[in-house]
Amino acid sequence: MKLPIYLDYAATTPVDPRVAEKMFQCMTMDGIFGNPASRSHRYGWQAEEAVDIARNQIAELINADHREIVFTSGATESNNLAIKGVAHFYHKKGKHIITSKTEHKAVLDTCRQLEREGFEVTYLEPAANGIIPMERLEAAMRDDTILVSIMHVNNEIGVIHDIDAIGELCRSKGIIFHMDAAQSAGKVPIDVQATKVDLISISGHKMYGPKGIGALYVRRKPRIRLEAQMHGGGHERGMRSGTLPTHQIVGLGEAAAIAKAEMASDDARIGALRDKLWNGIKHIEETYINGDAIERVSGSLNVSFNYVEGESLMMALKDLAVSSGSACTSASLEPSYVLRALGLNDEMAHSSIRFSIGRFTTEEEIDHAIEVITQSIDKLREMSPLWEMFKDGIDLNQVQWAHH
């Protein structure tokens, strides 16, 4: 067993060896290294064919048409292109956008930028289980609302939104629906023929593909128009210029094909490991799951250990590669804004750990994790004056702390 045990699959996944092998075939002189836009010789034609195959593989994962797939550098760029692209193209129709307070920073900061440009954004509060209630979404809709951007699966707490219901509501009001699927593509079934979603952001490195590559699904019927954010050679039907990185695209395509073929078996195995982990630690006093316990992606478990300081817990769990929030904000000592939005106080938000399990996690690793977590919590609480006060029956919310 390799230490530390990797339980941070929501931050990134290792590239599947089958994906890495395919990628390597597109890099050297012996392989398919040509520029897919070079139409005058075989090297370019081979590269273009490899890109076309990958585009089809990604389209098949979400039951889309291959012409609806636009390659980007990742979900952050896809989110930027979708949200800014719609806002800039449809600004004459309206300047109101709806999103939620628990979105990834790539959505929130894009919306903040649009606010600086004169757009108006409504940030919806989730319910205590982390899911946006439909009535709140409907109540926020206005005549000048042009876009709703709600994530499929939350990156910190793993809850799954009812995208079918959101899609129906948006379509009935003539509002474009964008979905950030960085955490769900390849893990949760997505069918664009059944779900009325107009734009989907996809990330390669969250589904055992390479970093630095992603895709944006852009619906053709009814047709969604975007204003390009990257200008140049007019690649990707003018929506995203830049030489296509054949090796990364082939990697993303292979990752999508494997995910589609193995989704059900992966989901069952990973879900069983997640349940094993929770069943092994839920007996620890004052331990709580954050987010809905049922409507969640199989590999995610976000737990608050009350009366334990998050950073000291992270240090105590040095044998486990886990996080106290999203990797993109883990350098910050601020408590998770997602957990705060669920109504957790600073202390509870600070004492939370995100465990995310994936394709290469083993039973042995989960057994070891349970042991390490149990021992660490006991040890830290033994040293905690707050835990002692709580055990003595003192209501810590009533304590008047002296200010220095």
Swiss-Prot record:
Residues given in the record as [2Fe-2S] cluster binding sites: 328
Family matches, as InterPro entries: Aminotrans_V_dom, Aminotrans_V_PyrdxlP_BS, Cys_deSase_IscS, Cysteine_dSase, PyrdxlP-dep_Trfase, PyrdxlP-dep_Trfase_major, PyrdxlP-dep_Trfase_small
Residues annotated as catalytic: 328 (cysteine persulfide intermediate)
Pathway connected to this protein: Cofactor biosynthesis; iron-sulfur cluster biosynthesis
GO biological process: [2Fe-2S] cluster assembly
EC number: 2.8.1.7
Gene Ontology cellular-component terms listed: L-cysteine desulfurase complex
Cellular localisation: Cytoplasm
Reported cofactor(s): pyridoxal 5'-phosphate
Enzyme class: transferase
Modified-residue entries (N6-(pyridoxal phosphate)lysine), positions: 206
Record bears the keyword Protein transport: no
Pfam families reported for this sequence: Aminotran_5 (PF00266)
Function: Master enzyme that delivers sulfur to a number of partners involved in Fe-S cluster assembly, tRNA modification or cofactor biosynthesis. Catalyzes the removal of elemental sulfur atoms from cysteine to produce alanine. Functions as a sulfur delivery protein for Fe-S cluster synthesis onto IscU, an Fe-S scaffold assembly protein, as well as other S acceptor proteins.
Family: Belongs to the class-V pyridoxal-phosphate-dependent aminotransferase family. NifS/IscS subfamily.
Protein name per Swiss-Prot or TrEMBL: Cysteine desulfurase IscS
